[in-house]
């Protein structure tokens, strides 16, 4: 089963590609809407500015292509900026996101930005325990690697949260065929590799 890794010049393609391969999946780089037909699972990484990301996707024809992909029920996995673009808007810019989630991405209301380094995932509430994508009970004390200045403070569809400077924020979120992470699983060691295998298994079943 081919995993499409979207290349829109906004992410660390090499480390994400290697992590997917370590999860025993074949990687196919996607740079245009027509190439979406060649893959079964879509992974969208990303680090950088929200507006620039949406504009680059538009230039490649992928903004509409990804929206259609999600609407058809195909599996989408987002990382960091790849999570942010799933929301309607961001305080970081004026472009519209894909609108899968209704909340707004906001600048973190903290003293030290970016939120960078290892942080514990909180997966104890009912949404986490009822996750259709990840069996969080199998890794109850997970730590993941974060690098971000913007995020989502709350969502009913969050399946994991984290707390930084006493501010709780979304660490992972899911809705039907979409699963996205604020943290970087490709930089999160053994837990990250385990998580890749979990989400790939779910994505392959869709």
From Swiss-Prot:
InterPro entries: Class_I_gatase-like, GATASE, Imidazole-glycPsynth_HisH. This is Imidazole glycerol phosphate synthase subunit hisH. GO terms for molecular function: glutaminase activity; imidazoleglycerol-phosphate synthase activity; lyase activity. Its EC number is 4.3.2.10, 3.5.1.2. Heterodimer of hisH and hisF. The keyword S-adenosyl-L-methionine does not apply. It is found in: Plastid, Chloroplast. PROSITE patterns: GATASE_TYPE_1. IGPS catalyzes the conversion of PRFAR and glutamine to IGP, AICAR and glutamate. The HisH subunit catalyzes the hydrolysis of glutamine to glutamate and ammonia as part of the synthesis of IGP and AICAR. The resulting ammonia molecule is channeled to the active site of HisF. Keywords: Amino-acid biosynthesis, Chloroplast, Glutamine amidotransferase, Histidine biosynthesis, Hydrolase, Lyase, Plastid. The gene is hisH. It comes from Cyanidioschyzon merolae (strain NIES-3377 / 10D).
């Amino acid at each position: 089963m081919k995993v499409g890794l979207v290349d829109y010049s906004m992410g660390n393609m090499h480390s994400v590609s290697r992590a997917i391969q370590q999860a025993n999946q074949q990687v196919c780089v996607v740079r245009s809407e027509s190439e979406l037909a060649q893959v079964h699972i879509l992974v969208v990484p990303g680090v950088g500015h929200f507006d620039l990301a949406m504009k680059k996707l538009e230039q490649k024809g992928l903004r509409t292509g990804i929206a259609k992909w999600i609407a058809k029920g195909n599996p989408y996995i987002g990382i960091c900026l790849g999570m942010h673009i799933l929301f309607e808007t961001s305080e970081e810019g004026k472009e519209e996101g894909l609108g899968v989630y209704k909340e707004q991405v906001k600048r973190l209301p903290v003293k030290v930005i970016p939120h960078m380094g290892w942080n514990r995932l909180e997966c104890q509430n009912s949404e986490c325990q009822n996750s259709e994508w990840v069996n969080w009970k199998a890794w109850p004390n997970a730590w993941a690697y974060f690098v971000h200045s913007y995020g989502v403070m709350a969502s009913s569809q969050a399946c994991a949260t984290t707390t930084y400077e006493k501010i709780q924020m979304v660490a992972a979120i899911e809705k039907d065929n979409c699963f996205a992470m604020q943290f970087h699983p490709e930089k999160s060691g053994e837990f990250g590799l385990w998580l890749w295998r979990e989400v790939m298994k779910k994505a392959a079943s869709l």
